[in-house]
Amino acid sequence: MSNSTSTPNTGLSYKDAGVDIEAGDALVDRIKSVAKRTTRPEVMGGLGGFGALCKIPKGYEEPVLVSGTDGVGTKLRLALNLNRHDTIGQDLVAMCVNDLLVCGAEPLFFLDYYATGHLNVDVAANVVTGIGKGCELAGCALVGGETAEMPGMYEGEDYDLAGFAVGVVEQSKIIDGSKVKSGDVLIGVASSGAHSNGYSLLRKILDVKNVDLTQVIDGRPLADVAMEPTRIYVKPVLELCKQVDVHAMAHITGGGLPGNLPRVLPNGAQAVINEASWEWPELFKLLQREGNVERFEMYRTFNCGVGMVIAVDANDAEKAIEVLNAQGEKAWKIGHIQENAESVEGADEKIRVIFE
């Protein structure tokens, strides 16, 4: 038996395990003003409750709720590498609300999930400020979220994001693609850049080819162009829906034009895209050139300058373009719909969408 005197054990705390409750509380205090700026009259109460309450807006006869969730992919890795955290939150909101918009829904509220190995309050506050800006652009309320500090799950201050949005649409005005017919015109709406898709290939090209991120393209450093936040189309497109009978919409995300257009096409309808109708932004030209990427691979990986495609009757096409342009968007005729018996659900994307 040892005669040595033992030192009394010191009790361990949650902070010793890597979780700083005070830092989490400080973050909540920092973001309350952000959430307040996004509030809507339907929201009941503020941040801090176990659940967020929201009324259905007045004026709906048969309201249908629409929900969606998304992330920002490996654009987040680029943000971490560049130490730029002020716009990635806007990307997160955009990816969710633009998806709701496709069926004609007005976004009501948004929640976020922020997970990290070690909470950096300044970084997290920057991210949430971007989320707030995105919510303001979309007209939806930031009603809550979750900040999870999980040591051992993430490396240092690296973090991951997820977003959740809920919107509402009148049942009789749901846009589901069922009206799409041969002769409809497809309208392209310009993207602001790569948005939040294709960044694994983008980063691979930049890394393998040692591309200089300070080089200037389109009058800006490449790093700025690559981090340009995803465009939020909510307000302009909802205005369009008030003035024009929209037959279908596709948010051009992962899978590009050939991967997303078929999601809103009825059987027997084939999308024909006129490649000469627009010029790829310099970012995509650079990526194709530096990576020697085959053209169709570019189309199925990146949006190539097209963030949204909208199908309308040919007689409404000019008005639709005028409405969108008046709202500050860049819109143009990008193609049309034609009949093709082989263009059915499950068919190869090269049959459902053709480029000419």
Swiss-Prot record:
Pathway: Purine metabolism; IMP biosynthesis via de novo pathway; 5-amino-1-(5-phospho-D-ribosyl)imidazole from N(2)-formyl-N(1)-(5-phospho-D-ribosyl)glycinamide: step 2/2
First-level EC class: ligase
InterPro entries: PurM-like_C_dom, PurM-like_C_sf, PurM-like_N, PurM-like_N_sf, PurM_cligase
Domain of life: Bacteria
Family matches, as SUPFAM superfamilies: PurM C-terminal domain-like, PurM N-terminal domain-like
Keyword Nucleotide-binding among record annotations: yes
Main localization category: cytoplasm
Pfam family, one: AIRS_C
EC number: 6.3.3.1
Alphabetical UniProt keywords: ATP-binding, Cytoplasm, Ligase, Nucleotide-binding, Purine biosynthesis
Swiss-Prot/TrEMBL catalytic activity: 2-formamido-N(1)-(5-O-phospho-beta-D-ribosyl)acetamidine + ATP = 5-amino-1-(5-phospho-beta-D-ribosyl)imidazole + ADP + phosphate + H(+)
GO biological process: 'de novo' IMP biosynthetic process; adenine biosynthetic process
Entry annotated with the keyword Membrane: no
A single Gene Ontology CC term: cytosol
Subcellular compartments: Cytoplasm
A GO MF term: ATP binding
Family the UniProt entry places it in: Belongs to the AIR synthase family.
Protein name: Phosphoribosylformylglycinamidine cyclo-ligase
Gene source species: Acinetobacter baumannii (strain ATCC 17978 / DSM 105126 / CIP 53.77 / LMG 1025 / NCDC KC755 / 5377)
